[in-house]
Amino acid sequence: MILLTLLYLIIFYIIIDFIKKNYKTKNQLPSPLGIALPIIGHLHLLRTDPYKTLAKASKKTEHGILKCWNGEHLMVVVDNPSIIKQMYVNTNNFTDRPQTKVFEIISRNYKNSGFANGEKWKHLRGLYAPSFTKIKSRPHENIILKYVNFEIKSLKNHAITNSIYNPFLIENINSFGTKVITEIIFGREFSENEVYSLIGPMNKLFGILDTPFPSESISFLKPFYRRSYKECDKQCEELFKLVEKVYDDHLLNLDKDNPKDVMDVMIVETDFKEKDHVICICCDLLMGTKDTFNTIVLWFFVLMINYQDVQLKGYQEIIKVLECTGRDHVTIEDIDKLPYIDGIIKEISRIHPAGPLSVPRTAINDIMINGYFIPKGCHVFQNTYGAVYNYMKESDEPCKMKPERWIENEKLRKDGKLDPTNDLALISLPFSSGIRNCPGVGFAEYELFLLFSNIILNFHLSSPNNLKLNESGHFGLTMKPFPFLVDLKLR
C-alpha cells in the first residue's frame, strides 16, 4: 500500500511538473528547444556545447531571447545585443546571482563580491572597487612589466634550449596571471613555491567544476554528489587559509594613512571589522584571474599560430612604433599607437570568449522585456557566443580573425557613420555588461596588451608540424582549447 501510494505521488509529480514546464501563457518567451521533459526539462539537449545549441535555437526566435528548462530551473537566454543592454544596463533588475550549492561553497556562504546579492553585494563592491583606484596605476604597470620581462626572459631561455613549449604547464606561462595579481593584491612578490601553493587548490577546484553537476539542476540528486561538494569545499578552504595568513601578516605592518596594496585598502575601508569578506574578495580575484586570464592566453597562442599573417602584421606594427620611441619593449604608453595589437586582443575574446555563457544572474522581480514576461527568480544567461555569431553580418566573416575590423569600427564611430546594430563594442561583450560585469576588465586589458605585444615582438609562434591547431575547444568552467604545443623561435 505504501509503495503504491508512493508510485501515485511520483506519477502525480511528473504530470504536474510536465504541465508547469509546458503550459503556455500570455506574453511568454519562445521555447524553440521544444517540449520540456518532466524533471530534466531540456537538460538532455544541453549536455554538449550548450552555448552553441542555444545560439542555434535563438535563430528560430524573432528577438534573440528564449526560455528553456535546466532541470527544475527556468532559464532565460539572451544573445540580442540591444536586449542585453536593455536588461543589464538600463535596469537594475538583473544584478543578483542564483543561489546554488556550488556558488555557496566558492563564496564561503556568499561572503565574496562574485556571488553575494542585494545590499550585501553593493557593500562588497564598494570595498573592492575603490581599491583599484586608490592604488595609482603607474605602480600597477610597473608590476605587470616586471613579470612580462620575467616571462620573456624565461621564454627566451626555453627557445634557446628547446623550442617546443607547453603553455599549459604551471612552471610556464600558466602562472603569469597569478603572479601579477598576487603582487597587486598583497603588495609583495611571492616566491615560486608560494604562487604554486595558491595555484594548487585552484587547479583542483577548477578540475572538479569542469565536470557538470546535474545536482545543481535537479536538487534531489545532491546526496549523490556529496563527495564532489565536499572536495570543492576542501579546496576553497585551503585557499581561504592561505589568504588568511597573508591577511594576518598585513595587520602587523599596516599604515592606515598609506595603504600600499589592494588588501590594505580593503582592510582600512572595513575598519578592520570584516576579515572574512576581505579574504573572500581576494580569493575571488585570484580565482577569476587564474582561470579566465589563462584561458585567454591559451587562445592567444592558438590564434597566432593559426593566423600567421595576423602575427606578422602585429610584429610589423610594433617594430614601426618602437623605431620611433627608441625602446626595446612595449609599454602602456604605446597602447594608442598599436591599434592592430589592440584589435588582436579584442578578436581573441570575440572569437573564443572564455565564458561563452556568462555567469548567470537572476530576475529580482517580475518584469516585461521587449513585450515578454520574465518571472522573478528565473536564471538569466547572456549568450556571449550567440551575440557574436548571430548578430554579426555573414559578409563580415565572424568566424575569421580580422583585427582590422576593430580599427574600422572605431573610425566609423568617430565619423558618426557607425550602424548601432553592427557596433562590435556592443556585440562582443566577453566580460558581460552593466554594473555587474567583470570588475577587473580594464586592468586585465592592460595586462594582456603588455604580455601579448612583447611576446609577438620577441618570438615567432608556430606549431611543431606547421599545421593549424584545433579551434573547437573544450567547454567546462571556461572554454579552453585542447592541449597543444608551441614552436618558439627567437626573432
Swiss-Prot record:
Its EC number is 1.14.-.-. The chain crosses the membrane at residues 1-21. InterPro entries: Cyt_P450, Cyt_P450_CS, Cyt_P450_E_grp-I, Cyt_P450_sf, Cytochrome_P450_fam2. Heme binds at residue 438. It catalyses: discoidol + reduced [NADPH--hemoprotein reductase] + O2 = discodiene + acetone + oxidized [NADPH--hemoprotein reductase] + 2 H2O + H(+). Induction: Expression is almost undetectable in vegetatively growing cells. Small amounts of transcripts accumulate between 4-8 hrs of development, continue to accumulate until they peak at 16 hrs, and decline thereafter. CDD domains: CYP1_2-like. It is found in: Membrane. Belongs to the cytochrome P450 family. This is Cytochrome P450 monooxygenase 521A1. It comes from Dictyostelium discoideum (Social amoeba).
